[in-house]
Design a protein with these regions (language model features):
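C-terminal substrate-binding/catalytic lobe of Rossmann-fold NAD(P)-dependent oxidoreductases
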Residues: 1-36, 125-267
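N-terminal Rossmann-like NAD(P) cofactor-binding subdomain of oxidoreductases
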Residues: 1-141
Length: 267
């Protein structure tokens, strides 16, 4: 805990208030922090963003007992918390009479944006979309959970393979669109970014020129001539907002391949 003290101090300098439950409060106070009660903050704030892997548990034990006019947001792992929300994909869902939302994960945003750009925005009919998520082992800020060799994720969903395709299917199903999707995933020994392989099979033939034009017009997908994730990561670190790339995905232009009605590429 003490080695993250500087991170908390930086947030407080930017205007954040530190709140904690009774178990953690004494630890923070022993390091010199002013700490307010977590329970009090539940009452004072109108929007509660839960970034923990306990969103569903916290809803059942805490949030469901609070004022129903508050808004509750949970992270992508908490499937079933509420309807999916992906920025730029289904913003209209925020107008619904709903007080809790599930913020789609980075991979869900990535796949959804690819489908929006190359299928939905072009009024194409999709026969099938197949995706392989090449996932990083852990974040650059983490020491544990590193995988020293490629580790395969089980296909535990008969219809969709892994949860990645299922989540995107459910996201678009909320809009009345049912897409034929399948995903696989493998964890690689890297701390850089996730990489996504995709193959879209359309009802009719397409051309690379048309695909590149769709990519150029996309608001949330960017493109790059770089072919290594470390180069893309380095660019984001040097030039992105707080070192971040906030696009849904960065398409490697030279990876795009069109053969008749099939588009293949990496993001």
């Amino acid at each position: 805990l003490s080695d993250e003290k500087g991170k908390v101090e930086a947030l407080i300098r930017k205007g954040a208030k530190l709140v904690a439950n009774s178990d953690a409060k004494n630890d923070f106070q022993s390091m010199g922090f002013d700490v307010e009660d977590l329970e009090k903050s539940y009452e004072e704030n109108q929007v509660i963003i839960d970034c923990t892997p306990s969103g569903n548990k916290n809803w059942g034990e805490i949030y469901s007992n609070l004022d129903k006019d508050k808004r509750f947001l949970a992270q992508g792992s908490e499937h079933g918390f509420g309807p999916f929300f992906a920025w730029g994909i289904n913003n209209n869902v925020l107008a619904n009479d709903q007080n809790k939302y599930l913020i789609a994960s980075c991979n869900t945003h990535n796949i959804a944006s690819i489908l929006k750009t190359f299928v939905l925005d072009t009024d194409k009919n999709l026969n099938e979309g197949r995706f392989v998520c090449l996932r990083r082992a852990n974040d650059v800020s983490q020491n544990d959970s590193f995988s020293p060799s490629p580790t395969i994720t089980k296909h535990d969903n008969q219809e969709f393979g892994t949860h990645h395709a299922r989540d995107v299917f459910e996201l678009f199903k909320q809009e009345g669109k049912k897409l034929n999707l399948f995903s696989s995933a493998i964890k690689l020994p890297t701390q850089y970014m996730h990489t996504l392989w995709f193959n879209l099979s359309f009802e009719k033939n397409t051309e690379l020129k048309e695909v590149l034009n769709s990519l150029e017009n996309s608001e949330f997908l960017m493109s790059t001539e770089k072919l290594s994730s470390n180069k893309v990561f380095s660019f984001g670190r040097d030039h992105g907002y707080h070192g971040r790339l906030l696009s849904h995905g960065i398409i490697a232009k030279d990876s795009l391949h069109v053969k008749e009605n099939n588009l293949t590429g990496y993001c």
